[in-house]
Amino acid sequence: MLKIGVIADDFTGATDIASFLVENGMPTVQINDVPTGTQPEGCDAVVISLKTRSCPAQEAIKQSLAALVWLKKQGCQQVYFKYCSTFDSTAEGNIGPVTDALMVALDTSFTVISPALPVNGRTVYQGYLFVMNHLLAESGMRHHPINPMTDSYLPRLMEAQAQGRCGVIPAQTLDEGVAATRAALSRLQQEGYRYAVLDALNERHLEIQGEVLRDAPLVTGGSGLAMGLARQWAKHGVSQARSAGYPLSGRAVVLSGSCSQMTNQQVAFYRQHAPTRDVDVARCLSSETREAYAEALAQWVLSQDSELAPMISATASTQALAAIQQQYGATEASHAVEALFSLLAARLAEGGITRFIVAGGETSGVVTQSLGITGFHIGPCISPGVPWVNALHAPVSLALKSGNFGDESFFIRAQREFQV
């Protein structure tokens, strides 16, 4: 029987939480889009990767409920709605509406909000969300192009988009332990609260959350809570849980589409050590020039024989990105570059590339779709929340990195620390 079923609102976020489950002893498979078949064998948890983070609430609800139907058919014991640790959802967002829809479908009147991921600098204190010691609304998320986060107080954010009152379980209560936390949650529920934001400043707080919530029908949050829950559910050692996703041997490539601050640092560092080509957006705009350009880039990648994998980068600084968007249009430029990566990934796979290291959520989704990958086994972590994975039905390994995850040397470590 499936122990945990995760409904994740974007691709790299799904891989992120899957890696935390594996690293805490739960063999895990990630499936892209709503599954149609039966549960893959040999796993205790399934993560369903949707593309609902930025879509209208009704569409997000529809897809999330479809995923829930499949999980119920597999006998899933606990449902986990996973969203970003920066709570990417304004009053017009869909975290609240999806949470409410799942609560109705699971016949539960109370759930938790736990976006914290302390290992990556996302903490919650007194209900306020912090990113690297800055309040959410004072971090780079205040400039997010789709979901600008201008408030840091999670209960207020939740109440603006959901159907009930939201309370807080403060860090002091978590410090008192499991019994105190369980009692505080019970009090909020009795007082008519529908949601409870859980503070978390450290790993111990997440462990307490996991113990308290082991039998909850529905939890919501980022990846941190998954660590606490997995430690309650796990029956396997970490090495056994990782084994199915250990990277294959073969040639590798780095494809970078994210323009986040960390990815800019990673690309700048990596280009000092490996052959690199930057994407020319002008050559991506029409289908005719794009196809020829993708072929030229593929031939260049396949001709390299360096120790470290060649890199194709569309990563740009904030100023350079603004100039590109002004010249070509933000949507047009983004779609053109992703279309290039789609063509390029398919051509590289045909040419014998078996390991793809990809930066950026949208780019990761495009690459896996282009390669026809519908799901994969989760392997060992390169950085917190970024594992190697192996495709379920193809000889392909991928490292799929959300924009701001990983350290400066991520692209190098992904290769040198996992040599076959």
UniProtKB/Swiss-Prot annotation:
It catalyses: 3-dehydro-L-erythronate + ATP = 3-dehydro-4-O-phospho-L-erythronate + ADP + H(+); 3-dehydro-D-erythronate + ATP = 3-dehydro-4-O-phospho-D-erythronate + ADP + H(+). The keyword Translocase does not apply. ATP binds at residues 258, 360-363, 403. Its EC number is 2.7.1.217. The gene is otnK. Catalyzes the ATP-dependent phosphorylation of 3-oxo-tetronate to 3-oxo-tetronate 4-phosphate. GO terms for molecular function: ATP binding; kinase activity. Disruption phenotype: Deletion mutant is unable to use L-threonate or D-erythronate as a carbon source. This is 3-oxo-tetronate kinase. Keywords: ATP-binding, Carbohydrate metabolism, Kinase, Nucleotide-binding, Transferase. InterPro entries: 4-carb_acid_sugar_kinase_N, 4-carb_acid_sugar_kinase_N_sf, NBD_C, NBD_C_sf, OtnK. Belongs to the four-carbon acid sugar kinase family.
